[in-house]
């Protein structure tokens, strides 16, 4: 194990970057950067059936978008490569041969049907399913007989009996496993491909990984990996297992849970900001001192302390994510937010696919109107429905406002002045409303609320003069005249 902090994020290229995996990558990144160490990305691609053609590219693209810059990987070899497991067979094979030669591993010829029958029988007896060791001591004659039958062997690790495997987890504290509860497990599958627990231990050792930080669904893998380290006389890395991420029902976040968007790609498509998502994910199972919740990446690196990783499950709060992103949206200049929102405006046919300067100018005004309210760039479409949909039927409260005694007088004066107004801009509209106030004597809520309800159908919203400008003269006059 290296004295220098070296951590790794090791995804399989089987799909988009999941929130849970993004958190694993992010905490490893913060830990490495806090201690001036190395953040390594290794691709665990030995499951060829599940690998997607663009799975690896997607992982790297989304990690880069989040701001997780790696020090080593397939594109940055620092002497510890190859960084794809599929390219490391030449490293694994001599070690497999060594374990076989030292009788620390053996060939198992049992078929899938035989193993399944054993498993079902154990479950029927109320026992924990585990391999019973039927082929742990085959004679050479028995091995030859199985091979003559055409059976392909897997290779199993010979688990030492009556031994306790313990490790001091940086999150959970001391964790122990009794080896008698772990059957001899497969280190090489029948197709010759090393299994996860074997390959990952070998890779972590040869890449001099100092700390393995991952989700607590990997706790049960840890004793098997420690066995591999001990079999070769190597020092294991330090381990840290992060708490689960749970949904509103406090159930483990599942990829089948349709209530929560779970892939970074989905948040990108909606127009979330990478620094906001970074901020939100960094607080899933970790907390800083104090009450502050908004930090830059550099601030997170400075204050990160692995001792503050939580043992309790981390709640994925959709409202909290929306709030965090809104804080960042408010800080951005309008042009940045407009460029993020533009594809959404085009998709909703609010702006033509080939927009004119006039279209773009209108779009910028629309964004300026809603920027402080927006949780994400794509939200501009539902927020601004009044600009492109028919006026909704008024609710009871809105009806009371618009049926006020002074409303016809108010609308008549306002309609007349706005009809003649040029240029139709917010500053001039504001002056016009003040003139109407002086002429009619109507003021306060009796002035502003009926105007807002008449032109938007809503009781509340952004600055009224700005809203009227963005709606445009024709639409505003059409909406006002029915209340004259």
From Swiss-Prot:
Catalyzes the attachment of glutamate to tRNA(Glu) in a two-step reaction: glutamate is first activated by ATP to form Glu-AMP and then transferred to the acceptor end of tRNA(Glu). It comes from the Bacteria. It comes from Staphylococcus aureus (strain Newman). Monomer. It is an enzyme of class 6 (ligase). GO terms for biological process: glutamyl-tRNA aminoacylation. The lineage of its organism: Bacteria, Bacillati, Bacillota, Bacilli, Bacillales. Belongs to the class-I aminoacyl-tRNA synthetase family. Glutamate--tRNA ligase type 1 subfamily. A motif ('HIGH' region) lies at residues 11-21. InterPro entries: aa-tRNA-synth_I_cd-bd (IPR045462), aa-tRNA-synth_I_codon-bd_sub2 (IPR020751), aa-tRNA-synth_I_CS (IPR001412), aa_tRNA-synth_I_cd-bd_sf (IPR008925), Glu-tRNA-ligase_bac/mito (IPR004527), Glu/Gln-tRNA-synth (IPR000924), Glu/Gln-tRNA-synth_Ib_cat-dom (IPR020058), GluQ/Sye (IPR049940). It is found in: Cytoplasm. Keywords: Aminoacyl-tRNA synthetase, ATP-binding, Cytoplasm, Ligase, Nucleotide-binding, Protein biosynthesis. It catalyses: tRNA(Glu) + L-glutamate + ATP = L-glutamyl-tRNA(Glu) + AMP + diphosphate. One of its GO terms (cellular component) is cytosol. A motif ('KMSKS' region) lies at residues 252-256. One of its GO terms (molecular function) is zinc ion binding. This is Glutamate--tRNA ligase. CDD domains: GluRS_core (cd00808). Its main location: cytoplasm. PANTHER family: GLUTAMATE--TRNA LIGASE, GLUTAMATE--TRNA LIGASE, MITOCHONDRIAL-RELATED. ATP binds at residue 255. The keyword ATP-binding applies. Its EC number is 6.1.1.17.
């Amino acid at each position: 194990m290296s004295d220098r902090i070296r951590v790794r994020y090791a995804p399989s290229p089987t799909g988009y970057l999941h929130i849970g995996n993004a958190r694993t990558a992010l905490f490893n990144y913060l830990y490495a950067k806090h201690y001036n160490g190395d953040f390594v990305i290794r691709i665990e691609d030995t499951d060829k059936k599940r690998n997607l053609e663009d799975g690896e590219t997607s992982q790297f693209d989304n990690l880069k978008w989040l701001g997780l810059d790696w020090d080593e990987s397939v594109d940055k070899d620092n002497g510890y490569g190859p960084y794809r497991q599929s390219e490391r067979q030449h490293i694994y094979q001599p070690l497999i041969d060594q374990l076989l030669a030292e009788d620390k591993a053996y060939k198992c010829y049992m078929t899938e049907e035989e193993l399944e029958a054993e498993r079902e029988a154990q479950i029927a007896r109320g026992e924990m399913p585990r391999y019973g060791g039927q082929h742990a001591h085959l004679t050479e004659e028995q091995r030859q007989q199985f091979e003559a039958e055409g059976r392909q062997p897997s290779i199993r690790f010979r688990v030492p009996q009556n031994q306790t495997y313990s490790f001091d987890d940086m999150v959970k504290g001391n964790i122990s496993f009794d080896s008698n509860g772990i059957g001899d497990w497969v280190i090489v599958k029948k197709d010759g491909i090393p299994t996860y627990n074997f390959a990952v231990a070998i890779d972590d050792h040869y890449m001099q990984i100092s700390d393995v930080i991952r989700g607590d669904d990997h706790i049960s893998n840890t004793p098997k990996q420690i066995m591999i380290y001990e079999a070769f006389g190597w020092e294991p890395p330090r381990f840290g297992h992060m708490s689960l991420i749970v949904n509103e029902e406090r159930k483990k976040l599942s990829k089948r849970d349709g209530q929560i968007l779970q892939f970074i790609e989905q948040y990108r498509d909606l127009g979330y900001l990478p620094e906001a998502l970074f901020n939100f994910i960094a607080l899933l199972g970790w907390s800083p001192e104090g009450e502050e919740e908004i930090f830059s990446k550099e601030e997170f690196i400075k204050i990160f302390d692995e001792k503050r990783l939580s043992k309790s499950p981390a709640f994925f709060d959709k409202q909290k994510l929306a709030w965090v992103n809104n804080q960042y949206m408010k800080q951005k200049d309008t042009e940045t937010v407009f460029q993020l929102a533009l594809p959404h405006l085009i998709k909703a046919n609010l702006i033509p696919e080939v927009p004119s300067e006039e279209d773009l100018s209108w779009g910028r005004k629309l964004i300026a109107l809603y920027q402080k309210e927006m949780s994400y760039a794509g939200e501009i479409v539902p927020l601004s429905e009044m600009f492109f949909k028919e006026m909704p039927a008024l609710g009871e409260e809105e009806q009371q406002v618009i049926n006020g005694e002074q409303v016809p007088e108010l609308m008549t004066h306002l309609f007349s002045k706005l009809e003649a107004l040029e240029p139709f801009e917010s500053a001039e509209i504001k002056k016009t409303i003040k003139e109407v106030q002086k002429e009619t004597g109507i003021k306060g809520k009796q002035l502003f609320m009926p105007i807002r309800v008449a032109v938007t159908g809503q009781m509340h919203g952004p600055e009224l003069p700005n809203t009227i400008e963005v709606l445009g003269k024709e639409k505003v006059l059409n909406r006002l005249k029915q209340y004259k």
